Amino acid sequence: MSRKCPLTGKRPRRGYSYTLRGIAKKKKGIGLKVTGKTKRRFFPNMLTKRLWSTEENRFLKLKISASALRHIDKLGLEKVLERAKSKNF
C-alpha cells in the first residue's frame, strides 16, 4: 500500500533536518548556529482502521491519515468518501 491517504491526499513531503550548536538566546546564550543540514522525509500519520459503512452494510478496511479520521468523526464516512471521489484522491 502507498503512503498516500485516499481521503485527504496527504503524502510524504521532503525537507531538512538541521543540526544545531550553541545555547539559545532565551537561556542567555549567544544563539544557535546551524552546523549541518540533512535531507529527510516527513510522513503523514497513517492508521489502518476498520470503519462501518451504513450504505454498504459492511466494514471497510482503510489506511487513512489521522486528520481523515477526524473528518470522518465530524462529517460521517459516506460524506468524506464522496468528497474524496470528487477530488480524485
From Swiss-Prot:
Record-level GO cellular component terms: ribonucleoprotein complex; ribosome
Lineage top rank: taxon: Bacteria
A Pfam short name: Ribosomal_L28
Keyword list, A-Z: Ribonucleoprotein, Ribosomal protein
Single Gene Ontology BP annotation: translation
A GO term, aspect molecular function: structural constituent of ribosome
Classification via InterPro entries: Ribosomal_bL28, Ribosomal_bL28/bL31-like_sf, Ribosomal_bL28_bact-type, Ribosomal_bL28_sf
HAMAP family reported in the protein's UniProt record: Ribosomal_bL28 (MF_00373)
Family according to the record: Belongs to the bacterial ribosomal protein bL28 family.
Official protein name in the record: Large ribosomal subunit protein bL28
